[in-house]
Amino acid sequence: MRCETYAVEEAEPIAAVAALIDAHRPDGRRLRELLCLLADGPTDLAELVRRSALPRKTVEEMLAAVGSDLAREGGKAAIAAGKADAYRKRFGFEQLSATRLADPLQRRLADAVAVQRVMEHVIAGAPAALTELDHVQATPETAVRRALWLDSTYDLRGAVVLCVGDHDLTSLAVGQVTPGARIVVADIDERILQYIDGWAARLRLDIRCYVSDFRFWLAEAAAGCADLVFTDPPYTPEGMTLFTARALQGLANKDHGRVVVAYGYSDRHPSLGLQGQAAASRLGLAAEEQLRAFSRYEGAQAVGSASDLYVWRPTSRSWQLLDGVVSGMQANIYTRGGQSLEGAPQGGHSGWSAMPPPVLRVTADDGFQLRVVAASAWTGAWAGQTAGPARIRLGTLFSTGIPAGMMTRTPFALAADLRADPGAWLLRVLLAANADRVAAVVPSGHRDVRDEAGQRALAALVESKFTLRFLNGQPDAGNTIVVATAVSSGTSVATWLLRQAHGKIGNVWRDALLAADTGEPALTKREARASVEARASRQEILSARLIDLPRHQLALLLEECDDVGGT
Protein backbone atom coordinates (compact mmCIF):
# COMPACT_ATOMS: atom_id res chain seq x y z
CA MET A 1 0.00 0.00 0.00
CA ARG A 2 2.84 2.35 0.81
CA CYS A 3 4.37 1.80 -2.63
CA GLU A 4 1.04 2.48 -4.35
CA THR A 5 0.61 5.76 -2.43
CA TYR A 6 4.12 6.84 -3.43
CA ALA A 7 3.38 6.16 -7.08
CA VAL A 8 0.22 8.28 -6.98
CA GLU A 9 2.03 11.16 -5.26
CA GLU A 10 4.89 11.14 -7.74
CA ALA A 11 2.43 11.38 -10.61
CA GLU A 12 1.13 14.67 -9.23
CA PRO A 13 2.35 18.07 -10.55
CA ILE A 14 4.26 18.83 -7.36
CA ALA A 15 6.54 15.88 -8.07
CA ALA A 16 7.21 17.12 -11.61
CA VAL A 17 8.10 20.51 -10.14
CA ALA A 18 10.51 18.88 -7.69
CA ALA A 19 12.19 16.99 -10.51
CA LEU A 20 12.58 20.18 -12.53
CA ILE A 21 14.16 22.00 -9.58
CA ASP A 22 16.48 19.08 -8.84
CA ALA A 23 17.63 19.10 -12.46
CA HIS A 24 18.77 22.72 -12.05
CA ARG A 25 20.71 22.16 -8.84
CA PRO A 26 22.56 24.20 -7.53
CA ASP A 27 20.68 26.93 -9.39
CA GLY A 28 17.33 25.49 -8.34
CA ARG A 29 16.83 28.31 -5.88
CA ARG A 30 15.86 30.62 -8.73
CA LEU A 31 13.09 28.20 -9.72
CA ARG A 32 11.89 28.07 -6.11
CA GLU A 33 11.75 31.88 -6.17
CA LEU A 34 9.63 31.58 -9.32
CA LEU A 35 7.24 29.34 -7.40
CA CYS A 36 7.03 32.02 -4.70
CA LEU A 37 5.86 34.48 -7.35
CA LEU A 38 3.21 32.03 -8.51
CA ALA A 39 2.06 31.51 -4.92
CA ASP A 40 1.80 35.26 -4.29
CA GLY A 41 -1.06 35.72 -6.75
CA PRO A 42 -2.03 35.86 -10.43
CA THR A 43 0.86 37.04 -12.62
CA ASP A 44 1.24 37.15 -16.40
CA LEU A 45 4.06 35.47 -18.27
CA ALA A 46 5.99 38.65 -19.07
CA GLU A 47 6.01 39.68 -15.41
CA LEU A 48 7.09 36.20 -14.29
CA VAL A 49 10.01 36.33 -16.71
CA ARG A 50 11.03 39.86 -15.73
CA ARG A 51 10.79 39.37 -11.95
CA SER A 52 12.50 35.98 -11.93
CA ALA A 53 15.09 36.92 -14.59
CA LEU A 54 14.68 33.40 -15.94
CA PRO A 55 14.46 32.71 -19.69
CA ARG A 56 10.92 32.48 -20.99
CA LYS A 57 11.42 28.85 -21.94
CA THR A 58 12.41 27.96 -18.37
CA VAL A 59 9.35 29.79 -17.00
CA GLU A 60 7.15 27.94 -19.48
CA GLU A 61 8.67 24.64 -18.35
CA MET A 62 7.78 25.47 -14.76
CA LEU A 63 4.22 26.42 -15.70
CA ALA A 64 3.89 23.13 -17.58
CA ALA A 65 5.21 21.22 -14.57
CA VAL A 66 2.78 22.89 -12.15
CA GLY A 67 0.09 22.03 -14.69
CA SER A 68 -3.28 21.30 -13.13
CA ASP A 69 -2.21 22.91 -9.85
CA LEU A 70 -2.38 26.29 -11.57
CA ALA A 71 -5.35 28.61 -11.50
CA ARG A 72 -5.53 30.66 -14.69
CA GLU A 73 -7.54 33.79 -15.32
CA GLY A 74 -7.28 36.46 -18.00
CA GLY A 75 -3.80 35.50 -19.17
CA LYS A 76 -2.46 35.29 -15.63
CA ALA A 77 -1.54 32.25 -13.57
CA ALA A 78 -1.08 31.39 -9.89
CA ILE A 79 -0.78 28.26 -7.81
CA ALA A 80 -4.33 27.30 -6.88
CA ALA A 81 -5.31 28.40 -3.38
CA GLY A 82 -5.90 24.84 -2.22
CA LYS A 83 -2.44 23.78 -3.35
CA ALA A 84 -0.33 26.74 -2.20
CA ASP A 85 0.40 25.43 1.32
CA ALA A 86 1.74 22.17 -0.05
CA TYR A 87 4.13 24.07 -2.32
CA ARG A 88 5.22 26.36 0.52
CA LYS A 89 6.15 23.40 2.70
CA ARG A 90 7.65 21.21 -0.02
CA PHE A 91 9.89 23.93 -1.46
CA GLY A 92 10.82 25.83 1.68
CA PHE A 93 9.34 29.25 1.02
CA GLU A 94 10.09 30.30 4.62
CA GLN A 95 13.76 29.39 4.15
CA LEU A 96 13.85 31.43 0.96
CA SER A 97 12.42 34.44 2.76
CA ALA A 98 14.79 34.09 5.72
CA THR A 99 17.93 33.77 3.58
CA ARG A 100 17.11 36.17 0.73
CA LEU A 101 19.83 38.82 0.44
CA ALA A 102 18.84 42.41 1.06
CA ASP A 103 18.92 44.83 -1.87
CA PRO A 104 21.80 47.25 -1.14
CA LEU A 105 19.95 49.96 -3.08
CA GLN A 106 16.64 49.55 -1.24
CA ARG A 107 17.06 52.60 1.01
CA ARG A 108 18.25 54.84 -1.81
CA LEU A 109 15.42 53.67 -4.06
CA ALA A 110 12.94 54.63 -1.35
CA ASP A 111 14.49 58.09 -1.22
CA ALA A 112 14.42 58.42 -5.02
CA VAL A 113 10.67 58.02 -5.53
CA ALA A 114 10.46 61.43 -7.23
CA VAL A 115 13.20 60.51 -9.70
CA GLN A 116 11.47 57.25 -10.52
CA ARG A 117 8.19 59.04 -11.17
CA VAL A 118 9.95 61.37 -13.57
CA MET A 119 11.57 58.42 -15.33
CA GLU A 120 8.23 56.63 -15.63
CA HIS A 121 6.83 59.69 -17.38
CA VAL A 122 9.93 60.13 -19.53
CA ILE A 123 10.07 56.51 -20.67
CA ALA A 124 6.33 56.37 -21.36
CA GLY A 125 6.71 59.18 -23.90
CA ALA A 126 9.95 58.01 -25.52
CA PRO A 127 10.19 57.32 -29.26
CA ALA A 128 9.27 53.78 -30.23
CA ALA A 129 12.04 51.21 -30.11
CA LEU A 130 13.77 50.28 -33.37
CA THR A 131 13.88 46.50 -33.23
CA GLU A 132 16.40 46.29 -36.08
CA LEU A 133 18.84 48.14 -33.81
CA ASP A 134 18.13 45.73 -30.92
CA HIS A 135 16.33 48.39 -28.88
CA VAL A 136 14.51 46.85 -25.91
CA GLN A 137 13.33 49.34 -23.31
CA ALA A 138 14.68 49.01 -19.77
CA THR A 139 12.20 49.61 -16.98
CA PRO A 140 12.09 53.02 -15.25
CA GLU A 141 13.30 51.40 -12.03
CA THR A 142 16.31 50.01 -13.90
CA ALA A 143 17.30 53.46 -15.15
CA VAL A 144 17.11 54.78 -11.58
CA ARG A 145 18.95 51.78 -10.13
CA ARG A 146 21.78 52.29 -12.61
CA ALA A 147 22.07 55.94 -11.64
CA LEU A 148 21.97 55.17 -7.91
CA TRP A 149 24.51 52.39 -8.20
CA LEU A 150 26.93 54.58 -10.16
CA ASP A 151 26.47 57.39 -7.65
CA SER A 152 27.01 55.01 -4.71
CA THR A 153 30.07 53.37 -6.25
CA TYR A 154 32.02 56.21 -7.89
CA ASP A 155 32.79 59.86 -7.25
CA LEU A 156 30.96 61.52 -10.12
CA ARG A 157 31.03 65.10 -8.81
CA GLY A 158 32.57 67.12 -11.63
CA ALA A 159 33.12 63.93 -13.63
CA VAL A 160 32.12 63.29 -17.24
CA VAL A 161 29.90 60.26 -17.88
CA LEU A 162 29.57 59.05 -21.48
CA CYS A 163 26.64 56.92 -22.60
CA VAL A 164 27.59 54.89 -25.67
CA GLY A 165 24.03 54.51 -26.89
CA ASP A 166 21.14 55.49 -24.62
CA HIS A 167 17.78 54.22 -25.76
CA ASP A 168 17.13 53.37 -22.10
CA LEU A 169 17.48 57.08 -21.18
CA THR A 170 19.94 56.25 -18.41
CA SER A 171 21.55 59.66 -18.93
CA LEU A 172 18.44 61.44 -17.65
CA ALA A 173 18.40 59.33 -14.49
CA VAL A 174 22.12 59.90 -13.85
CA GLY A 175 21.68 63.63 -14.36
CA GLN A 176 18.93 63.79 -11.73
CA VAL A 177 20.72 61.59 -9.18
CA THR A 178 24.14 63.21 -9.66
CA PRO A 179 23.56 66.81 -10.81
CA GLY A 180 27.27 67.59 -10.46
CA ALA A 181 28.16 65.26 -13.32
CA ARG A 182 28.38 66.30 -16.97
CA ILE A 183 26.89 63.72 -19.29
CA VAL A 184 27.63 63.07 -22.96
CA VAL A 185 25.35 60.86 -25.05
CA ALA A 186 26.33 59.36 -28.39
CA ASP A 187 23.63 57.45 -30.28
CA ILE A 188 22.62 56.54 -33.82
CA ASP A 189 18.94 57.41 -33.27
CA GLU A 190 18.38 61.14 -33.71
CA ARG A 191 14.85 60.82 -32.33
CA ILE A 192 16.27 59.66 -29.01
CA LEU A 193 18.90 62.41 -29.01
CA GLN A 194 16.25 65.09 -29.57
CA TYR A 195 14.09 63.55 -26.85
CA ILE A 196 16.95 63.47 -24.34
CA ASP A 197 17.95 67.00 -25.29
CA GLY A 198 14.43 68.26 -24.68
CA TRP A 199 14.13 66.60 -21.29
CA ALA A 200 17.61 67.72 -20.27
CA ALA A 201 16.58 71.32 -20.90
CA ARG A 202 13.33 70.83 -19.00
CA LEU A 203 15.13 69.28 -16.01
CA ARG A 204 18.09 71.66 -16.31
CA LEU A 205 20.62 68.85 -16.69
CA ASP A 206 24.07 69.16 -18.27
CA ILE A 207 23.67 66.61 -21.06
CA ARG A 208 25.27 66.93 -24.49
CA CYS A 209 24.05 64.82 -27.40
CA TYR A 210 25.92 63.74 -30.54
CA VAL A 211 25.18 61.46 -33.46
CA SER A 212 27.36 58.38 -33.84
CA ASP A 213 26.99 55.10 -35.68
CA PHE A 214 29.59 53.13 -33.76
CA ARG A 215 30.17 50.83 -36.72
CA PHE A 216 31.68 53.79 -38.57
CA TRP A 217 32.60 56.57 -36.19
CA LEU A 218 32.40 57.97 -32.68
CA ALA A 219 31.56 61.67 -32.52
CA GLU A 220 34.75 63.66 -32.06
CA ALA A 221 33.30 65.50 -29.05
CA ALA A 222 32.62 62.14 -27.37
CA ALA A 223 36.09 60.70 -27.98
CA GLY A 224 38.48 61.01 -25.05
CA CYS A 225 35.97 62.96 -22.96
CA ALA A 226 34.89 60.70 -20.11
CA ASP A 227 35.89 59.45 -16.69
CA LEU A 228 33.30 56.66 -16.84
CA VAL A 229 31.40 55.12 -19.75
CA PHE A 230 28.10 53.25 -19.62
CA THR A 231 26.79 51.14 -22.49
CA ASP A 232 24.04 48.57 -23.12
CA PRO A 233 25.18 47.06 -26.45
CA PRO A 234 23.56 44.61 -28.86
CA TYR A 235 23.75 41.17 -27.23
CA THR A 236 26.02 39.63 -29.83
CA PRO A 237 29.78 39.07 -29.51
CA GLU A 238 30.35 41.55 -32.33
CA GLY A 239 28.05 44.16 -30.81
CA MET A 240 29.58 43.73 -27.38
CA THR A 241 33.10 44.09 -28.76
CA LEU A 242 32.33 47.15 -30.89
CA PHE A 243 30.41 49.11 -28.26
CA THR A 244 33.01 48.29 -25.62
CA ALA A 245 35.77 49.44 -27.96
CA ARG A 246 33.96 52.73 -28.58
CA ALA A 247 33.51 53.05 -24.82
CA LEU A 248 37.27 52.76 -24.43
CA GLN A 249 37.76 55.42 -27.10
CA GLY A 250 35.50 57.65 -25.04
CA LEU A 251 37.67 57.49 -21.92
CA ALA A 252 39.85 60.48 -21.06
CA ASN A 253 41.18 58.94 -17.85
CA LYS A 254 43.17 55.99 -19.16
CA ASP A 255 44.52 54.99 -15.76
CA HIS A 256 41.44 55.15 -13.56
CA GLY A 257 38.51 55.25 -15.99
CA ARG A 258 35.85 52.55 -15.93
CA VAL A 259 33.63 50.93 -18.55
CA VAL A 260 30.26 49.75 -17.19
CA VAL A 261 28.39 47.38 -19.48
CA ALA A 262 24.91 45.83 -19.40
CA TYR A 263 24.95 42.48 -21.18
CA GLY A 264 22.33 39.75 -21.12
CA TYR A 265 22.33 36.12 -22.19
CA SER A 266 20.19 33.09 -21.48
CA ASP A 267 21.46 30.81 -18.74
CA ARG A 268 20.33 28.01 -21.02
CA HIS A 269 23.20 29.03 -23.32
CA PRO A 270 26.19 29.97 -21.13
CA SER A 271 28.45 29.91 -24.18
CA LEU A 272 26.81 33.18 -25.25
CA GLY A 273 27.86 34.68 -21.94
CA LEU A 274 31.39 33.49 -22.57
CA GLN A 275 31.38 35.03 -26.04
CA GLY A 276 30.23 38.34 -24.62
CA GLN A 277 32.86 38.30 -21.92
CA ALA A 278 35.48 37.49 -24.55
CA ALA A 279 35.07 41.08 -25.74
CA ALA A 280 36.76 42.18 -22.54
CA SER A 281 39.62 39.79 -23.16
CA ARG A 282 40.05 40.97 -26.77
CA LEU A 283 40.43 44.51 -25.45
CA GLY A 284 42.72 43.69 -22.54
CA LEU A 285 40.17 44.71 -19.91
CA ALA A 286 40.30 43.59 -16.29
CA ALA A 287 36.96 42.48 -14.81
CA GLU A 288 36.17 44.15 -11.48
CA GLU A 289 32.51 43.28 -10.88
CA GLN A 290 29.56 41.37 -12.27
CA LEU A 291 26.12 42.05 -10.79
CA ARG A 292 23.68 39.35 -11.86
CA ALA A 293 20.33 40.34 -13.37
CA PHE A 294 20.84 43.98 -12.41
CA SER A 295 18.83 45.48 -15.29
CA ARG A 296 15.26 44.51 -16.23
CA TYR A 297 13.51 45.11 -19.55
CA GLU A 298 10.07 45.32 -21.14
CA GLY A 299 10.86 42.46 -23.49
CA ALA A 300 13.95 40.35 -24.27
CA GLN A 301 12.22 37.36 -22.69
CA ALA A 302 14.68 34.91 -24.24
CA VAL A 303 17.34 36.24 -21.86
CA GLY A 304 14.99 36.54 -18.90
CA SER A 305 14.15 40.21 -19.59
CA ALA A 306 17.35 40.92 -17.69
CA SER A 307 21.03 41.67 -18.10
CA ASP A 308 24.07 41.53 -15.86
CA LEU A 309 26.09 44.62 -15.02
CA TYR A 310 29.82 44.32 -15.71
CA VAL A 311 32.56 46.70 -14.62
CA TRP A 312 35.75 46.62 -16.63
CA ARG A 313 38.95 48.53 -16.13
CA PRO A 314 41.42 49.18 -18.95
CA THR A 315 45.00 48.01 -18.70
CA SER A 316 48.04 49.19 -20.63
CA ARG A 317 47.32 46.38 -23.09
CA SER A 318 43.87 47.81 -23.82
CA TRP A 319 45.33 50.82 -25.59
CA GLN A 320 47.67 48.63 -27.64
CA LEU A 321 44.78 46.47 -28.86
CA LEU A 322 42.09 49.10 -29.37
CA ASP A 323 42.79 50.36 -32.90
CA GLY A 324 43.17 46.86 -34.29
CA VAL A 325 39.88 45.71 -32.81
CA VAL A 326 37.96 48.74 -34.12
CA SER A 327 39.41 48.52 -37.63
CA GLY A 328 38.52 44.85 -37.90
CA MET A 329 34.86 45.18 -36.93
CA GLN A 330 31.99 44.48 -39.33
CA ALA A 331 28.72 46.37 -39.68
CA ASN A 332 26.36 43.44 -39.07
CA ILE A 333 26.31 43.35 -35.27
CA TYR A 334 22.62 43.05 -34.35
CA THR A 335 20.40 40.07 -33.60
CA ARG A 336 17.54 40.95 -35.96
CA GLY A 337 16.89 42.49 -39.37
CA GLY A 338 19.05 43.17 -42.41
CA GLN A 339 21.97 44.34 -40.26
CA SER A 340 21.98 41.26 -38.05
CA LEU A 341 24.68 38.63 -38.18
CA GLU A 342 22.38 36.44 -40.27
CA GLY A 343 21.67 39.37 -42.60
CA ALA A 344 25.29 39.81 -43.68
CA PRO A 345 25.70 39.29 -47.44
CA GLN A 346 27.40 36.12 -48.55
CA GLY A 347 30.32 36.02 -50.95
CA GLY A 348 31.94 39.29 -49.93
CA HIS A 349 30.49 41.36 -52.79
CA SER A 350 31.56 44.98 -52.83
CA GLY A 351 29.35 48.03 -52.86
CA TRP A 352 30.75 48.94 -56.29
CA SER A 353 29.84 45.68 -57.99
CA ALA A 354 26.43 45.71 -56.27
CA MET A 355 25.58 49.38 -56.86
CA PRO A 356 22.31 49.61 -58.82
CA PRO A 357 23.02 50.87 -62.38
CA PRO A 358 20.38 53.66 -62.18
CA VAL A 359 22.34 55.20 -59.32
CA LEU A 360 25.46 55.21 -61.44
CA ARG A 361 23.64 56.69 -64.44
CA VAL A 362 22.27 59.74 -62.62
CA THR A 363 25.77 60.65 -61.47
CA ALA A 364 26.79 61.01 -65.12
CA ASP A 365 23.97 63.36 -66.15
CA ASP A 366 24.80 66.90 -67.26
CA GLY A 367 28.48 66.17 -67.80
CA PHE A 368 29.35 65.04 -64.25
CA GLN A 369 32.10 62.44 -63.87
CA LEU A 370 31.63 59.57 -61.41
CA ARG A 371 34.83 59.69 -59.38
CA VAL A 372 33.98 58.15 -56.00
CA VAL A 373 31.78 55.31 -54.79
CA ALA A 374 30.95 54.91 -51.09
CA ALA A 375 29.43 51.90 -49.38
CA SER A 376 29.12 50.53 -45.86
CA ALA A 377 31.61 48.08 -44.43
CA TRP A 378 29.16 45.18 -44.52
CA THR A 379 29.40 45.02 -48.31
CA GLY A 380 32.85 43.47 -47.99
CA ALA A 381 36.36 44.30 -49.04
CA TRP A 382 37.23 46.08 -52.26
CA ALA A 383 39.58 43.27 -53.26
CA GLY A 384 40.23 42.86 -56.95
CA GLN A 385 38.73 46.22 -57.93
CA THR A 386 41.36 48.31 -59.70
CA ALA A 387 39.49 50.07 -62.50
CA GLY A 388 36.69 52.59 -62.30
CA PRO A 389 35.91 55.18 -59.66
CA ALA A 390 37.81 55.49 -56.41
CA ARG A 391 36.18 53.59 -53.57
CA ILE A 392 35.83 54.62 -49.95
CA ARG A 393 33.98 53.22 -47.00
CA LEU A 394 31.29 55.18 -45.25
CA GLY A 395 33.44 55.18 -42.13
CA THR A 396 36.08 57.21 -43.95
CA LEU A 397 33.51 59.58 -45.40
CA PHE A 398 31.90 60.21 -42.01
CA SER A 399 35.19 60.51 -40.12
CA THR A 400 37.29 62.67 -42.44
CA GLY A 401 35.42 63.26 -45.70
CA ILE A 402 36.51 62.51 -49.26
CA PRO A 403 40.31 62.30 -49.41
CA ALA A 404 41.82 65.26 -51.26
CA GLY A 405 43.50 62.99 -53.78
CA MET A 406 40.11 61.82 -55.05
CA MET A 407 38.93 65.36 -55.85
CA THR A 408 41.61 66.45 -58.31
CA ARG A 409 39.28 66.69 -61.32
CA THR A 410 35.93 68.44 -61.54
CA PRO A 411 33.04 68.37 -61.99
CA PHE A 412 32.91 65.10 -60.13
CA ALA A 413 30.18 62.95 -58.64
CA LEU A 414 29.88 60.50 -55.77
CA ALA A 415 27.52 57.52 -55.65
CA ALA A 416 26.58 56.08 -52.25
CA ASP A 417 24.89 52.79 -51.48
CA LEU A 418 22.78 53.57 -48.39
CA ARG A 419 20.25 50.77 -48.68
CA ALA A 420 21.09 49.72 -45.12
CA ASP A 421 20.71 53.26 -43.74
CA PRO A 422 19.00 53.14 -40.31
CA GLY A 423 18.18 56.85 -40.65
CA ALA A 424 21.28 58.93 -39.93
CA TRP A 425 23.49 58.18 -42.94
CA LEU A 426 21.86 60.12 -45.78
CA LEU A 427 22.10 63.54 -44.14
CA ARG A 428 25.67 62.84 -43.07
CA VAL A 429 26.70 61.79 -46.58
CA LEU A 430 25.36 65.12 -47.84
CA LEU A 431 27.27 66.94 -45.10
CA ALA A 432 30.49 65.00 -45.61
CA ALA A 433 30.66 64.91 -49.41
CA ASN A 434 31.89 68.12 -51.04
CA ALA A 435 31.09 66.77 -54.47
CA ASP A 436 29.48 68.51 -57.43
CA ARG A 437 26.83 65.80 -57.47
CA VAL A 438 25.85 63.07 -55.03
CA ALA A 439 23.52 60.20 -55.86
CA ALA A 440 22.48 58.02 -52.95
CA VAL A 441 20.05 55.11 -52.84
CA VAL A 442 18.07 54.68 -49.61
CA PRO A 443 15.06 52.58 -48.57
CA SER A 444 11.75 54.16 -49.57
CA GLY A 445 10.66 54.05 -45.94
CA HIS A 446 13.59 56.22 -44.85
CA ARG A 447 12.49 59.20 -42.72
CA ASP A 448 14.02 61.69 -45.17
CA VAL A 449 12.25 60.39 -48.30
CA ARG A 450 9.08 58.54 -47.31
CA ASP A 451 6.82 61.59 -47.53
CA GLU A 452 6.83 65.19 -48.73
CA ALA A 453 7.40 66.57 -45.23
CA GLY A 454 10.58 64.53 -44.80
CA GLN A 455 11.86 65.52 -48.22
CA ARG A 456 11.22 69.21 -47.59
CA ALA A 457 12.93 69.07 -44.19
CA LEU A 458 16.05 67.43 -45.63
CA ALA A 459 16.19 69.87 -48.55
CA ALA A 460 15.90 72.83 -46.17
CA LEU A 461 18.81 71.62 -44.03
CA VAL A 462 21.25 71.44 -46.95
CA GLU A 463 19.84 74.16 -49.23
CA SER A 464 22.96 76.32 -48.85
CA LYS A 465 25.02 73.46 -50.28
CA PHE A 466 22.80 71.29 -52.52
CA THR A 467 19.51 71.24 -54.37
CA LEU A 468 17.81 67.87 -54.10
CA ARG A 469 15.74 65.64 -56.39
CA PHE A 470 13.95 62.54 -55.15
CA LEU A 471 13.51 59.71 -57.65
CA ASN A 472 10.87 57.67 -55.85
CA GLY A 473 10.62 53.98 -56.70
CA GLN A 474 14.07 53.88 -58.28
CA PRO A 475 15.98 51.66 -58.87
CA ASP A 476 13.03 49.54 -57.62
CA ALA A 477 9.83 49.88 -55.64
CA GLY A 478 11.58 49.43 -52.32
CA ASN A 479 14.14 52.21 -52.75
CA THR A 480 14.53 55.88 -53.63
CA ILE A 481 17.44 57.65 -55.29
CA VAL A 482 18.31 61.06 -53.86
CA VAL A 483 20.21 63.29 -56.29
CA ALA A 484 22.03 66.28 -54.79
CA THR A 485 23.52 68.94 -57.07
CA ALA A 486 25.85 71.57 -55.63
CA VAL A 487 24.59 75.15 -55.63
CA SER A 488 26.76 78.08 -56.68
CA SER A 489 29.44 78.75 -54.13
CA GLY A 490 28.29 81.31 -51.57
CA THR A 491 29.88 83.12 -48.66
CA SER A 492 27.16 82.71 -46.03
CA VAL A 493 28.10 81.16 -42.72
CA ALA A 494 25.67 78.32 -43.44
CA THR A 495 27.52 77.53 -46.66
CA TRP A 496 30.86 77.55 -44.86
CA LEU A 497 29.55 75.21 -42.17
CA LEU A 498 27.92 72.80 -44.61
CA ARG A 499 31.07 72.63 -46.73
CA GLN A 500 33.36 72.11 -43.74
CA ALA A 501 31.29 69.65 -41.75
CA HIS A 502 34.39 67.98 -40.28
CA GLY A 503 35.79 71.20 -38.81
CA LYS A 504 35.04 72.55 -35.36
CA ILE A 505 31.91 74.68 -35.64
CA GLY A 506 33.33 77.63 -33.72
CA ASN A 507 36.44 77.79 -35.90
CA VAL A 508 34.53 77.47 -39.18
CA TRP A 509 31.99 80.10 -38.15
CA ARG A 510 34.77 82.46 -37.09
CA ASP A 511 36.59 81.99 -40.39
CA ALA A 512 33.37 82.68 -42.29
CA LEU A 513 33.01 86.01 -40.50
CA LEU A 514 36.63 86.90 -41.20
CA ALA A 515 36.16 86.14 -44.91
CA ALA A 516 32.84 87.96 -45.27
CA ASP A 517 32.84 91.13 -47.36
CA THR A 518 30.27 93.23 -45.48
CA GLY A 519 31.58 96.66 -46.37
CA GLU A 520 32.48 97.16 -42.72
CA PRO A 521 36.03 97.25 -41.29
CA ALA A 522 37.54 93.79 -41.12
CA LEU A 523 37.13 91.90 -37.85
CA THR A 524 40.04 90.61 -35.83
CA LYS A 525 40.05 86.93 -34.87
CA ARG A 526 39.16 87.85 -31.31
CA GLU A 527 36.25 90.01 -32.44
CA ALA A 528 35.00 87.32 -34.80
CA ARG A 529 35.16 84.73 -32.05
CA ALA A 530 33.29 87.01 -29.66
CA SER A 531 30.60 87.54 -32.29
CA VAL A 532 30.22 83.79 -32.73
CA GLU A 533 29.90 83.20 -29.00
CA ALA A 534 27.34 85.98 -28.71
CA ARG A 535 25.15 84.49 -31.44
CA ALA A 536 25.39 80.79 -30.50
CA SER A 537 22.69 79.76 -28.03
CA ARG A 538 24.64 76.62 -27.09
CA GLN A 539 28.28 77.30 -26.40
CA GLU A 540 29.24 73.62 -26.12
CA ILE A 541 28.53 72.91 -29.78
CA LEU A 542 31.18 75.39 -30.91
CA SER A 543 33.85 72.79 -30.12
CA ALA A 544 31.92 70.02 -31.91
CA ARG A 545 31.79 69.09 -35.60
CA LEU A 546 28.71 69.81 -37.69
CA ILE A 547 28.53 66.21 -38.88
CA ASP A 548 28.16 65.03 -35.27
CA LEU A 549 25.21 67.28 -34.38
CA PRO A 550 21.70 65.80 -34.16
CA ARG A 551 19.58 67.31 -36.90
CA HIS A 552 17.40 69.36 -34.52
CA GLN A 553 20.54 71.12 -33.23
CA LEU A 554 21.86 71.46 -36.77
CA ALA A 555 18.67 73.20 -37.88
CA LEU A 556 18.84 75.62 -34.94
CA LEU A 557 22.49 76.41 -35.62
CA LEU A 558 21.87 77.18 -39.29
CA GLU A 559 19.02 79.51 -38.29
CA GLU A 560 21.24 81.36 -35.81
CA CYS A 561 23.99 81.97 -38.35
CA ASP A 562 21.71 82.51 -41.34
CA ASP A 563 21.83 86.31 -41.32
CA VAL A 564 25.62 86.54 -41.01
CA GLY A 565 27.87 87.12 -44.00
CA GLY A 566 26.98 87.37 -47.66
CA THR A 567 25.20 85.01 -49.99
Placement of each model-derived feature along the sequence:
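C-terminal substrate-binding/active-site "lid" region of AdoMet-derived donor-dependent transferases
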Residues: 245-301, 307, 442-466
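S-adenosyl-L-methionine
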Residues: 2-162, 167-176, 186-224, 228, 365-405, 444-454, ...
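A short glycine-rich, Lys/Arg-flanked "PGG" loop and its adjoining helix->strand segment in the class I
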Residues: 241-258, 426-436
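Structural motif
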Residues: 164-167, 187, 234, 264-266, ...
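A short acidic, Gly/Pro-enriched loop at the edge of an enzyme's catalytic core
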Residues: 215-229, 236-237, 376, 392, ...
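Conserved S-adenosyl-L-methionine
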Residues: 176-183, 434-436
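Short hydrophobic/aromatic beta-strand or adjacent loop that forms the aromatic wall/cage
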Residues: 304-310, 477-481
